[in-house]
Amino acid sequence: MATTKNLTQQQVEKIQIDEGLVYVDYGESSQRKLGPTRGGAEFSATATYRDIEFDGRVGKTAGMQTIDENQAALKVNSLCCSADELKLALPGCRVSGSGDNAVIKNAKAGVLNADGVSSVYCKNITMFAKLMDGKFKKITIYNGMNEGALTIKAVQKAENEIALEIYAHYTTSDLNGDLYQIEEVATDPQNAVANPQQEEE
């Protein structure tokens, strides 16, 4: 018997295409677009499953597994070496001045955010991935912080790439909260404004 290979219109329309657009603190007054980027953006969600051992067990058993840990991350390479991008790559770094006059120094050893500096964690990192039907998958990770190493290379006939590996974090006040959210939106993120209330005026 021949296997049916035809695709439905919905299957075609929901194919994700092209690179993603990434925003820091999307929908907040501090919203900004990341980049320019190279190589697109990659979201990953990982759960650590544990099988409950019991007498008579012969293999994996439905209802006898727990989730011990959840992780969510977004990876993206930025070509921008602005102070804002470097601060994102160096959580907890010490900054004096602003803009082109900013001076950035290493973070002090110790507990991050122990002094109440909220800038260590971004409110959110949001990626928009375009679908064939013109809509977008909007993927948001919460309380994002880069945990990758910063490398800056000056190479002839090449551009430096800042590799960001941003992980979502729970908060101490909500240890079972949301790490990420995936939804479908029709709005073109290129038309996004810093304060969403401005769109209503």
Task: Specify the residue positions occupied by each region the protein language model found.
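Noncatalytic linker/hinge segments flanking ATPase motor cores
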Residues: 64-66, 82-86, 115-122, 164-172, ...
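Solvent-exposed edge beta-strands and adjacent loop segments
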Residues: 2-88, 143-161
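Extended, positively charged loop/linker patches that create polyanion-binding surfaces
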Residues: 89-91, 95-132
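Short, flexible beta-strand-to-coil junctions
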Residues: 79-81, 128-135, 171
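Beta-strand secondary-structure signal
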Residues: 73-77, 124-128, 163-167
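Mixed-charge, glycine-accented linear interaction segment located at domain edges/termini
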Residues: 137-201
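Short, mixed charged/polar active-site loops
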Residues: 31, 135-138
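Hydrophobic beta-strand residues in large extracellular and virion-surface proteins
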Residues: 22-24, 125-127, 182
